């Protein structure tokens, strides 16, 4: 109940706050660093970034990622989505791109009742093992994405933060604020639609 109350207060308080993606051409690129853990430390900044798709990454975005030692790109979109809207990070020097499709969560659930089961199905997807092995074995920083950076990226973020020992309310908050990020389309992105 405490986590829910805090989440509700945060949503009311921050409803009109501006949420800014780390990349100028995405809506929802965020750092999983800086979260306090039960081990008395904080999660490492710029070690893992969550994002929506990087279909139109600008030179500035690419430089930002390279300068922050992001060397591994994990795209969880389906092959069909990748074919329609390819990632612009596939050929960036110093980065390795992986496509590990996660099919659950690629479409909107049929009902509100299905949402919690969808999260469980995402976590049970066959490619989840490959995703976490890739993150664990990455030589430096990782950015992972799905289409909106919401459900599939949200589940991976929640699992990573849980393993790192982050507080439950911080994990929930990390997921909930996504709706504020995806409301605000970056100005530099709108002309590319």
Predicted regions and their residues:
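Single conserved hydrophobic/aromatic residue that forms the stacking wall/gate
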Residues: 1-14, 191
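Cys-dependent protein tyrosine phosphatase-like superfamily
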Residues: 15-143, 155-193
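Short cysteine clusters
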Residues: 146
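Substrate/cofactor-recognition hotspot
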Residues: 149
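Conserved SAM/SAH-binding loop-helix junction
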Residues: 152
């Amino acid at each position: 109940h405490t986590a829910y109350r805090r989440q509700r207060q945060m949503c009311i308080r921050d409803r009109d706050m501006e949420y800014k993606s780390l990349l100028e051409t995405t809506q929802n690129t965020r750092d999983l660093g800086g979260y306090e853990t039960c081990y008395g430390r904080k999660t490492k900044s710029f070690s893992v970034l969550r994002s929506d798709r990087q279909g139109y990454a600008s030179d500035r975005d690419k430089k930002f990622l390279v300068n922050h030692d992001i060397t591994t790109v994990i795209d969880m979109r389906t092959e069909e989505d990748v074919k329609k809207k390819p990632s612009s990070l596939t050929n960036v020097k110093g980065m390795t791109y992986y496509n590990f499709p996660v099919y659950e969560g690629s479409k909107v659930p049929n009902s509100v009742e299905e949402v919690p089961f969808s999260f469980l199905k995402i976590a049970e997807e066959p490619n989840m093992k490959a995703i976490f092995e890739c993150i664990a074995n990455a030589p430096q920083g990782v950015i992972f994405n799905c289409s909106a950076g919401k459900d599939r990226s949200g589940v991976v973020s929640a699992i990573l933060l849980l393993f790192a020992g982050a507080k439950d309310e911080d994990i929930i908050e990390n997921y909930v604020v996504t709706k504020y990020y995806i409301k605000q389309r970056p100005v530099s992105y709108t002309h590319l639609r």
